[in-house]
């Protein structure tokens, strides 16, 4: 039996639109402050202009346990440059003004230091749609569940191939907007082959809920984006975009346009 997602979702209309167009959404991640704050904000608006449906605004953190080497290096550079949590909120505001949809992706500690309710308030005021919390599980998220409800934000939790049926069901039930399915075990990073565990993980989520599922951790090409877009509602790209940004904004735009074309290849019926 599947559970229908009844709570209003800020990202719901986007996924409805993508479904009507028979395609997946492109979800792109960049860390705030890399290579500097102003360039990172410009890069995020480039994502919007190049066909990215949702921008994940990363909050650099000093102990990024789930990030691969590309994102870790970018995070270290951003922290060395003095990036702050408020800079991420500025990025969200710029994305919103550019006509895009922004969610913040952060480990929980920076939000805890900022104040959960205050962060939710300021994120909503900046035009943000929600928050991805890779190291926060619903069982320990009472503060965030209350704050996201109070300010109407989506809350995106992670599931993995190792998630037990009970943990997966509980995580999906607590999520709103979409569920982040980690398609490979371990840290993030672009890979030549996308994990074959991803379709099975998406199917497990679909068996218990109609909430959209975004698949991440490994996408780097149009072909991989099209492959995942055949069974997932969202294709999440991080490390490949960070690498492209390291080569400059034109490289970032080119890759984003390529990935956007991939998710727009017609999905199988």
Curated annotation (Swiss-Prot):
GO terms for cellular component: cytosol. Keywords: Amino-acid biosynthesis, Aromatic amino acid biosynthesis, Lyase, Tryptophan biosynthesis. Gene3D superfamilies: Aldolase class I. Pathway: Amino-acid biosynthesis; L-tryptophan biosynthesis; L-tryptophan from chorismate: step 5/5. InterPro entries: Aldolase_TIM, RibuloseP-bd_barrel, Trp_synthase_alpha_AS, Trp_synthase_suA. One of its GO terms (molecular function) is tryptophan synthase activity. CDD domains: Tryptophan_synthase_alpha. It catalyses: (1S,2R)-1-C-(indol-3-yl)glycerol 3-phosphate + L-serine = D-glyceraldehyde 3-phosphate + L-tryptophan + H2O. SUPFAM superfamilies: Ribulose-phoshate binding barrel. Transmembrane segments: none annotated. Its EC number is 4.2.1.20. The active site is at residues 56, 67. The keyword Phosphoprotein does not apply. The alpha subunit is responsible for the aldol cleavage of indoleglycerol phosphate to indole and glyceraldehyde 3-phosphate. Tetramer of two alpha and two beta chains. Belongs to the TrpA family. This is Tryptophan synthase alpha chain.
């Amino acid at each position: 039996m599947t559970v229908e997602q009844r709570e209003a979702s800020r990202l719901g209309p986007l996924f409805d639109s993508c479904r009507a167009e028979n395609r997946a959404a492109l979800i792109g991640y960049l860390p705030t402050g890399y290579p500097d704050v102003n360039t990172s904000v410009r890069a995020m608006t480039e994502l919007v202009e190049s066909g990215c449906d949702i921008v994940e605004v990363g909050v650099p953190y000093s102990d990024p346990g789930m990030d691969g080497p590309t994102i870790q290096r970018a995070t270290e550079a951003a922290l060395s440059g003095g990036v702050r949590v408020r800079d991420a909120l500025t990025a969200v505001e710029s994305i919103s003004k550019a006509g895009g949809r922004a969610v913040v992706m952060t480990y929980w500690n920076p939000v805890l230091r900022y104040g959960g309710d205050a962060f939710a308030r300021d994120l909503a005021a900046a035009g943000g749609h929600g928050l991805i919390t890779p190291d926060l599980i619903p069982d320990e998220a009472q503060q965030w569940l209350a704050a996201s409800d109070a300010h109407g934000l989506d809350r995106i939790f992670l599931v993995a191939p190792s998630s037990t049926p009970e943990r997966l069901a509980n995580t999906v039930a607590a999520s709103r907007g979409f569920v982040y399915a980690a398609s490979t075990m371990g840290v993030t990073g672009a890979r030549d082959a996308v994990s074959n565990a991803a379709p099975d993980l998406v199917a497990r989520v679909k068996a218990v809920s109609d909430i959209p599922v975004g698949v991440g951790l490994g996408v780097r090409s149009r072909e991989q984006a099209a492959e995942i877009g055949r069974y997932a509602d969202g294709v999440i790209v991080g490390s490949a975009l960070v690498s492209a940004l390291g080569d400059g904004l034109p490289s970032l735009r080119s890759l984003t346009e390529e990935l956007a074309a991939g998710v727009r290849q017609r999905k199988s019926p």
